[in-house]
Amino acid sequence: DFIPAEGRKPGGWNFEITSEEDLNARVIRSSSCTVSIPELDLEVNPGGNATGYVTNMEGLLNRFIKIVEMVMKDLDESEKENLKTLNHMLHRLQNAGLERDGLHVELLDPHGLSQILHPDAIDRDLTDEELARLPVGPDPAVFSK
């Protein structure tokens, strides 16, 4: 995981993808970070085996695309409404930065180790409500003598 030298407080980062250039924004996601795309009602929470990673917005969106495609493969023909919704999500994710409508990405990290490195990225404190509902990712290893 990525641990900065200075102490961090719980925080969130918001970023709107409005151009192709925005896809190059650097993303640092720690193992305790929840990533969401509110317009599409998509959210990835850290699990017990979560690891951190460094990528850019395009790489982050590609992770969501793979998940949506995987869910689509598991649907049968009787689930046409769900398939329509997933196709819409896929289209928005694949065309982020190319269309008029922006796409918001939000990082919520109770440990404060995640960041979006771009001049237009907005950092903020997490609300008490967010802190109460957010998972914190894997438990650190504890060693005894």
Predicted segments with their positions:
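N-terminal cysteine/histidine-rich coordination modules
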Residues: 1-2
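Long C-terminal interaction/binding lobes of large macromolecular proteins
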Residues: 6-145
